[in-house]
Structure formats: C-alpha cells, structure tokens
Amino acid sequence: MTELKNDRYLRALLRQPVDVTPVWMMRQAGRYLPEYKATRAQAGDFMSLCKNAELACEVTLQPLRRYPLDAAILFSDILTIPDAMGLGLYFEAGEGPRFTSPIKSKADVDKLPIPDPEQELGYVMNAVRTIRRELKGEVPLIGFSGSPWTLATYMVEGGSSKAFTVIKKMMYAEPQALHALLEKLAKSVTLYLNAQIKAGAQSVMIFDTWGGVLTGRDYQQFSLYYMHKIVDGLLRENEGRRVPVTLFTKGGGQWLEAMAETGCDALGLDWTTDIADARRRVGHKVALQGNMDPSMLYAPAPRIEEEVATILAGFGQGEGHVFNLGHGIHQDVDPQHAGVFVEAVHRLSTPYHQ
C-alpha cells in the first residue's frame, strides 16, 4: 500500500506529536457543495450514489479538492446494515429514511440475517478499495458505522423519530426482544467495520447519534454495552499500523468516563460539552474529537476564527485533539465559510504543538 503523506489525523487519535491540529468535518462530502449535488443528480438518488463505487469515491474526494483536510471519510450511510438485513430502506421527500418492514417483535428479530459484508454490503467495500486507490496516500480514510442502539431506533421506529416512543416501549416492555436485536446488530457492525478495515479503512468511527435520548442507566445497558462489545471485536492493526477507533454519542457528554473505559482510542464530542472539561476528565486515556457548533459556519469569517481559537485554547497545549464540528455540517452553509474554518484550525493551532 502507498505510504501515507499526511498521517497527523492518525497520530492525533493516538495522542502522538503533530505539527498542527488535524481537522476534518462530519458530512464533509455533502449537500453544501454544489459539486456533490451535481454528482448526486447524476446518480439519480442517494442510495444509488452510495452503491456506485466510482461515484461514492468522487463525492468522498470532492471536499479534499477544496480544503486541506487531514482525513477523508467514506461516503456511505449508517443505514446500510438494516438495508442489507432486508428491511426495505427508502427515502421519503422531506421525511428522511423509512423502512417498509420495521421490527415489531422478537419473532421479527429472530428472522433477521447477519449480512455478509463482502456480499450484501460488497458495494461498501468496493467503495473503500476505490477511495483508497484514488487517495494515493494523501490522507487517511475513515470507515464508519452506526451504533447498534442508533440502528435499532430506525429499525423499530420505522424511520426517524423525535420522541422514540416505539423503541422505548420495546425497551421497557420487551427488553429481551431489544437485547436480541442489539446483539445481532453488534455482531453485524463488528463484521462490517472489520471488512472496511481489511478493504483499506485506516481508522473507524461508531456514530451513536441517538444514545443521548437515554437515561444514564439505559445508556450503559442498551448502547454503551454493545459498543464496548464491538470495540473488543475490532481489528486494531492493519498494514503495520494501529487502526484507531472513535466513539461518538451525540448528547453523551455526561458519560465520557464510561465511554473511555471501552478501550477506544478517541471520543467525539458534540458542541454542548466543554472541551477543557472533557480533557480534564478523560484526556489522560483518550484523544478528543470536536467540537464546534456546526451552526457557527453561518457566522462571518472573524467570528468563525474566534470560535476556533476559543476551542483550541480550551483543549490547550499538547496532543490528542482532532478538530471537527460537533455534528454534521448543515446543507445550506456557504462552502467558503467551511474553508475559513479549516484554514483557521491549521493556522491558529501551531503554537499549541511547539
């Protein structure tokens, strides 16, 4: 494999010295870029874009042509696993993802297959291999999956939700059915991420988008327990390098200590958590990724730079910080503002690494 020309993202995740703080953006390949919209129109629809390795590679590389980002992230969706399990994923205009056959009972769970990542999800692995080839060692490639809990919310609710009453009803009235589903999902995610690593992903991230809707006790039992199982089952070395693992629970700032106990290398922070506080609490165990409010990118350039400076100062001197937004970039952000953000991170972080 090609030697990595820029490995500062991987080094920062392992709390090793870097010259400047590395930066990438969640959803950096996305609808805020006109070139993304053009490629998506060419594909026809979102899942066709995900399933075409050449086009998925093209949109993965688009933000790297605009900005000096320190990592590429696979263009895919967290719902590829439930789709491969046969739930009938489709996208409703203005509604987001929906499933034709949501999970309603333990009997439904028992019927679910565990997808073979090189068969039913082979299109994802083809995309990983294509992107790695086209990156030519410029920056590392991040692979990812949704967490078992987050995937289960979509599978049981039948799509996006605001109150999560359907899955919480299952959690409190039929916990054994939900545990059976989460167990299957944990196995599926482990296989899926390991296949991404073998195909060329140099770091992986688990997105627990909806863990923050749980009580502390339920988070431990129904979300973190299964992420811990996945971390235990992941390949941690490939191509002679450690493959760092990042866990990200949106709204999970109060559980960082428990998350750091899983054996992951880094924790993602949303913008509601103070990064200085997070470093005091868990910085001796894990790297931290984050955590500017994505809405800050609507601000004028000086305000964006001021916010970058504040977060860098909050983390302070030394290693173990990957700069990112606290969640995905919004689709109506001016691409020039994203450029201001990336440039500011590199320029303003130099003194913190001397």
From Swiss-Prot:
The record marks D77 as: Transition state stabilizer. It comes from the Bacteria. GO terms for molecular function: uroporphyrinogen decarboxylase activity. It catalyses: uroporphyrinogen III + 4 H(+) = coproporphyrinogen III + 4 CO2. GO terms for biological process: protoporphyrinogen IX biosynthetic process from glutamate. Pathway: Porphyrin-containing compound metabolism; protoporphyrin-IX biosynthesis; coproporphyrinogen-III from 5-aminolevulinate: step 4/4. This is Uroporphyrinogen decarboxylase.
